[in-house]
């Protein structure tokens, strides 16, 4: 069936119309303002990723790929020798922007490998083509995740999700929200509960915004109410995205995901993870090996003077709590190998 249209006026991440810049929808300003930004300088691209102007593992990968290309083109003046000299440094600076999301490193690695195998005189064109391939693949992977995920989203489903893994987190219709968009397009009635997702409120600001724009019934709840909601039998399934999936099936996702998974298990509600193959990292053995990014204390609001903060951006949900993994290749089971990982 036709793919449902994006609930956004423009994709969250992609090329500018003239193909000379990285275009993003600045998510720091949502839902109050919709501001599109065109970026070409490496530092502003790194800053956009680091400050969550563009966020979501797949979207970060696309942003890094396009951003690396346009920054190299601008700063080299189109001179390949200069671009090759800048490549390693620019790639490393982008990879350091957010360490937990595997798609960022995956996309940069693809471009670096492309540069190394490309003949002299055609590197910049080859990098541009590879970045576009990464963007187009993400759109297709989102659609495939949505199609496969329809199997667990029946008519009348009541779904809980955490953070934002929708169109705002990808170049397409999302990962965790893709099956919901597909189900809605088929006329299935849905009730969605979106965790607020403190401290940056991605669920309240972003998930609720894009679902409501698509005409899907959505309610926001404080993070601390998720267990109560599950205990009252008001949820049929939980679907979340992922920033990195270890070889054994452990999943790093927005902090608070682990608590939702524990509550879902306690109340016998199936818990699914939706992610493209590019988010599976067979080189990371378990969740204990995943580097967890910590954010600044000022994200937590005003604190008493001298009181420190512990503010991890992600937590790790063990494989034992996960009913299934919905990927662009269908439902998969760990242990994961290179064959499960797109582009490795």
Swiss-Prot record:
Job of this protein: Catalyzes the interconversion of methylthioribose-1-phosphate (MTR-1-P) into methylthioribulose-1-phosphate (MTRu-1-P).
Highest taxon of source: Bacteria
Active-site residues per Swiss-Prot or TrEMBL entry: 243
Keywords on record: Amino-acid biosynthesis, Isomerase, Methionine biosynthesis
Biological source species: Gemmatimonas aurantiaca (strain DSM 14586 / JCM 11422 / NBRC 100505 / T-27)
Biological pathway: Amino-acid biosynthesis; L-methionine biosynthesis via salvage pathway; L-methionine from S-methyl-5-thio-alpha-D-ribose 1-phosphate: step 1/6
EC number: 5.3.1.23
Any matching Pfam family: IF-2B
Protein family (similarity comment): Belongs to the eIF-2B alpha/beta/delta subunits family. MtnA subfamily.
Record protein name field: Methylthioribose-1-phosphate isomerase
Record site feature (Transition state stabilizer), residues: 163
InterPro entries documented for this protein: IF-2B-related (IPR000649), IF-M1Pi (IPR005251), IF_2B-like_C (IPR042529), Initiation_fac_2B_a/b/d (IPR011559), M1Pi_N (IPR027363), NagB/RpiA_transferase-like (IPR037171)
GO MF annotation list: S-methyl-5-thioribose-1-phosphate isomerase activity
GO biological process per UniProt: L-methionine salvage from methylthioadenosine
Catalytic activity: 5-(methylsulfanyl)-alpha-D-ribose 1-phosphate = 5-(methylsulfanyl)-D-ribulose 1-phosphate
Enzyme class: isomerase
Organismal lineage: Bacteria, Pseudomonadati, Gemmatimonadota, Gemmatimonadia, Gemmatimonadales
List of residues binding substrate: 55-57, 98, 202, 253-254
PANTHER family: METHYLTHIORIBOSE-1-PHOSPHATE ISOMERASE (PTHR43475:SF1)
């Amino acid at each position: 069936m036709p793919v449902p249209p994006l609930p956004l006026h423009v994709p969250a991440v992609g090329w500018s119309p003239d193909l000379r810049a990285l275009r993003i929808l600045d998510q720091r300003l949502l839902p109050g303002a919709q501001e599109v930004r065109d970026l070409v300088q490496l530092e502003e691209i790194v800053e956009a990723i680091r400050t969550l102007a563009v966020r979501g593992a797949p979207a970060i990968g696309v942003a890094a790929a396009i951003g690396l290309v346009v920054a190299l083109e601008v700063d080299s003046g189109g001179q390949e020798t200069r671009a090759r000299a800048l490549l390693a440094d620019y790639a490393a600076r982008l990879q350091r922007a957010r360490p937990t999301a595997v798609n960022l490193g995956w996309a940069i690695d693809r471009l670096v490998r492309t540069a190394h195998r490309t003949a002299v005189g055609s590197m910049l064109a080859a990098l541009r083509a590879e970045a576009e391939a990464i963007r187009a693949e993400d759109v297709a992977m989102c659609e495939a995740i949505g199609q496969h995920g329809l199997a667990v989203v029946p008519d009348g489903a009541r779904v809980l999700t955490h953070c934002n893994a929708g169109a705002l987190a990808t170049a397409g219709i999302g990962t965790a929200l893709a099956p919901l968009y597909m189900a809605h397009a088929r006329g299935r009635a849905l009730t969605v509960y979106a965790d607020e997702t403190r401290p940056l409120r991605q669920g309240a600001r972003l998930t609720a915004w894009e679902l409501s724009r698509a005409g899907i019934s959505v309610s926001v709840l404080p993070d601390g109410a998720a267990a109560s909601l599950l205990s009252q039998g008001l949820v049929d399934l939980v679907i979340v995205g992922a920033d990195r999936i270890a070889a054994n099936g452990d999943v790093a996702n927005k902090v608070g995901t682990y608590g939702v998974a524990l509550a879902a298990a306690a109340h016998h509600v199936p818990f699914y993870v939706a992610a493209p193959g590019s988010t599976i990292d067979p080189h990371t053995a378990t969740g204990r090996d995943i580097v967890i990014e910590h954010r600044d204390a000022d994200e937590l609001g005003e604190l008493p003077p001298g009181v420190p903060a512990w503010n991890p951006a992600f937590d790790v949900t063990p494989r034992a709590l996960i009913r299934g993994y919905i990927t662009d290749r269908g439902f998969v089971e760990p242990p994961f190998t290179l064959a499960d990982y797109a582009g490795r």
